[in-house]
Amino acid sequence: MKVGIVGAMAQEVEILASLIENKNVVHIAGCTIYQGNIQDKEVALLQSGIGKVAAAMGTTLLLQMFKPDIVINTGSAGGVSSGLKVGDVVVSTQTVYHDADVTAFGYAKGQLPACPPAFISDPKLTALVENVAEQQGINLTSGLICSGDSFINSAEKLAWIKANFPEVVAIEMEATAIAQVCHKFNIPFVVIRAISDVGDGEASISFEEFLPLAARQSSSMVLKILQSL
């Protein structure tokens, strides 16, 4: 099985990149792709850059150039679900854009034309993450992950997202764009993120402080999933 892994920032991919054997590195259009092996799995690890366009462009390149069988999105996220704390892990059941609004034409909030109301993560991959977390005693929350081209750093913005997407468990800036590309290419995907902040007025301070912890936690979870595939 060939596994595509996508992270936005250097800090979110550097642990996994350091573990790749027989490494080949490709730089293209502002993206970096590390290809090789982790354990017995063939992997292509993409550092896409931040935001929806960067994530979509990088994921498209990843799928076209390396033809992975599945895609895992890793990195950090802002926690929304009550009880989530820094370092906890979330896994997607579905993803949606919190900053897309074509409701004037009858679409659901977050839905784009020619797309489903939400992008559904591969149920088998989500279940695998849940099972591994249970076996390892990892605090995991499953649910809706919302994406947008904003770092949420205010209680007002967070409240708006929660009001419009009440099932949301975490927020970030790339997952739904990655999911949309995978949907178009018919490639199974799942999002595994660790919490770096809680999206309130202190989020930027928390993010800077706890990004390394979130990167370690999400990378560790991805490694456990690779072992289980």
Swiss-Prot record:
Record gene name: mtnN
Annotated transmembrane regions: none
Name the record gives this protein: 5'-methylthioadenosine/S-adenosylhomocysteine nucleosidase
A Gene Ontology molecular function term of the record: methylthioadenosine nucleosidase activity
UniProt-listed Enzyme Commission number(s): 3.2.2.9
Enzyme class, UniProt record, top EC level: hydrolase
Stored Pfam families: PNP_UDP_1
InterPro entries linked to this entry: MTA_SAH_Nsdase, Nucleoside_phosphorylase_d, Nucleoside_phosphorylase_sf
Similarity field: Belongs to the PNP/UDP phosphorylase family. MtnN subfamily.
Domain of life: Bacteria
Pathway entry: Amino-acid biosynthesis; L-methionine biosynthesis via salvage pathway; S-methyl-5-thio-alpha-D-ribose 1-phosphate from S-methyl-5'-thioadenosine (hydrolase route): step 1/2
A single BP term in Gene Ontology: L-methionine salvage from methylthioadenosine
Reactions catalysed: S-adenosyl-L-homocysteine + H2O = S-(5-deoxy-D-ribos-5-yl)-L-homocysteine + adenine; S-methyl-5'-thioadenosine + H2O = 5-(methylsulfanyl)-D-ribose + adenine; 5'-deoxyadenosine + H2O = 5-deoxy-D-ribose + adenine
Keywords annotated in UniProt: Amino-acid biosynthesis, Hydrolase, Methionine biosynthesis
Keyword Hydrolase belongs to the record: yes
Annotated GO CC locations: cytosol
Keyword Translocase: no
Catalytic residues identified in the record: 12, 197
Binding of substrate, residues: 78, 152, 173-174
SUPFAM superfamilies from the UniProt entry: Purine and uridine phosphorylases
